[in-house]
From Swiss-Prot:
GO terms for biological process: ribosomal small subunit assembly; translation. Pfam families: Ribosomal_S2. The modification N-acetylserine is found at S2. CDD domains: RPS2. The gene is RPS0. GO terms for molecular function: structural constituent of ribosome. The lineage of its organism: Eukaryota, Fungi, Dikarya, Ascomycota, Saccharomycotina. This is Small ribosomal subunit protein uS2. Residues 210-261 are annotated as: Disordered. The keyword Ribonucleoprotein applies. Gene3D superfamilies: Glucose-6-phosphate isomerase like protein, domain 1 (3.40.50.10490). It comes from Candida dubliniensis (strain CD36 / ATCC MYA-646 / CBS 7987 / NCPF 3949 / NRRL Y-17841). Belongs to the universal ribosomal protein uS2 family. Required for the assembly and/or stability of the 40S ribosomal subunit. Required for the processing of the 20S rRNA-precursor to mature 18S rRNA in a late step of the maturation of 40S ribosomal subunits. The keyword Acetylation applies. GO terms for cellular component: cytosolic small ribosomal subunit.
Length: 261
């Protein structure tokens, strides 16, 4: 059975997936994830078939694009590495982001202020986002999940096999899904046109590391500005205007003229 051309993984996307370690799976394999294993390394780590990862990304994007109202898609991430990614995904596609702890009753208890009725739920990790998946099963909401080889597949309708523990892997998968959704909606005209948003925007950034880098940049700027400021004050020093008439001193030219040669 031949698949459409959109399901073919391009060399550029394959390089991105390998560079972000999307292919590095867990050592344990859940029975439903066995078809996604390419091979097992001598150290026991399972290598994920990135061709099947890409096929599931395209399938998930088609499901997302089929939802008429973009805000009816809820994207969840209790895992820290995925919170920035889901927020960026929501900003670019119009979905509803639930970053951080999932409040129990979000999908089932209509009395709560945070009550939502999405038509589709996407989670970063079936283990950390188990509450969201469980509530989705109660109200018949389909679930798309980023699954590692050891992730449970109960109540998951579409599993995207990938490394869902690395910050670069999680960010890249969300970026690829967002790009594919925008292609299907026609915002990105065709597959030859590159998306202006870089994958780095979806990667998790440690707040302490960001503050440290900002402080170091500020220090280097101060060190560079200090010599320039000293040089400016040295050359722009104002000279005092002296009134020679008040001081009683006569100019040298008058002294020479008055003297008898």
């Amino acid at each position: 059975m031949s698949l459409p051309a959109s399901f073919d993984l391009t060399p550029e996307d394959a390089k991105l997936l390998l560079a972000a370690n999307v292919h590095l799976g867990a050592k344990n394999v859940q029975v439903h994830n066995k078809p996604y294993v390419y091979k097992t390394r001598p150290d026991g780590m399972n290598i994920i078939n990135i061709g099947k990862t890409w096929e599931k990304i395209v399938l998930a994007a088609r499901i997302i694009a089929a939802v008429p109202n973009a805000s009816d898609v809820a994207v969840c991430s209790s895992r820290t590495f995925g919170q920035r990614a889901v927020l960026k995904f929501a900003a670019h596609t119009g979905a509803t982001a639930i970053a951080g702890r999932f409040t129990p009753g979000n999908f089932t208890n209509y009395i709560t202020r945070s009550f939502k009725e999405p038509r589709l739920v996407i989670v970063t990790d079936p283990r950390t986002d188990a509450q969201a998946i469980k509530e989705s099963s109660y109200v018949n909401i389909p679930v798309i999940a980023l699954t590692d080889m050891d992730s449970p597949s109960e109540y998951v309708d579409v599993a995207i096999p990938c490394n869902n523990k690395g910050k670069h892997s999680i960010g890249l998968i969300w970026w690829l899904i967002a790009r594919e959704v925008l292609r299907l909606r026609g915002i990105i005209p065709d597959r030859t046109t590159e998306w202006s948003v870089m994958p780095d925007l979806y990667f998790y950034r440690d707040p302490e590391e960001v503050e440290q880098n900002a402080a170091e940049e500020a220090k280097t700027e101060e060190v560079e500005e200090a010599p320039v400021a000293e040089a400016e004050t040295e050359w722009t020093g104002e000279t005092e205007d002296v009134d020679w008439a008040d001081s009683g001193a006569t100019p040298a030219a008058e002294d020479a003229a008055a003297s008898n040669w």
